[in-house]
Structures are given as C-alpha cells and as structure tokens.
Amino acid sequence: LRAIDPRNAYLMDSMLRDVTIYGTAARASSTLKRRDLAGKTGTTNEHVDAWFCGYQQTVVACSWIGFDQPRNLGSGETGGTAALPTWISYMAKVLKDVPESFLPAPEGVVAVASPSSSGKGPAEELFYQENAPAELEPEPPVDHSIKPED
C-alpha cells in the first residue's frame, strides 16, 4: 500500500531540503555539515509560537518554543531563530555517526537547470516528466548521494 505517488514524496523532500540549505533554516545544513536535512520553520501571529519540524531519512524531530499561556515571544523570535537552534543541537547528537542518506529519484521525475540571478538557490528545479518545459532540456535529477568535489 502506497500513501502517495513516489514522485510527490521526492518533490516534497527536495523542496523541504531547500529550506535547510537556502531558506529560513539554512543554518541547519551549514552547522551540521549535512545536505540530507529537510524541514519547515513556523511562526504564529504576534510571535506567540515558534517552531521547526525537520527530518533526515532515519529520524524526525520538532522543536516548539512558546508559553503555556500564550504571549508574545518578542519581535525577533521566529522558527528559524528561536526553535531551530534546539533542533540543531538535538540532531547533532542523534546523527553523530549516521551517514548522509537521500531518497533515490523515482521514475518520471526530471530536472532542469535553474537560472538564478543571485547565484543563491537550487541549481535545478524538478518536474514530473510530463510537465517539464521541453525547451529547457530536462534530464535526470542530480544524485545527491554523490558528494561534490571540494
């Protein structure tokens, strides 16, 4: 029994990994020196709650910062500033000797080069094969289990 199309799982994993590499949780990958982390930051209205939920292929963890009786945490307290450091500290311990692990790309997913004017952000964008813009010459996604040359 499969809950969702493997292509959806792969695309979501890719988007959530981008959060920990280029987005509001980029400190996770840079601090832990891993590319296989994924997650989502969150901050409620009026900065009452801050959270980060993230995972690696072998472990999932969430960090929530707030008060039992809701009140403002402070204007600078967000998921990326208040909750993420706790998550990073926990994951540093549980992933200490765990090698990086990535979902393999399923059949039917292709990548196209991602033009970026800033040089920041993902080098490729993923598509269902049948929805890829043909003029951008789709090809198989990058195998993230292969470490780039230093």
Feature names for model-found ranges:
Residues 1-41, 45:
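A conserved catalytic-loop motif detector
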Residues 30-150:
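Soluble, non-transmembrane domains of envelope/secretory-pathway proteins that act on or interact
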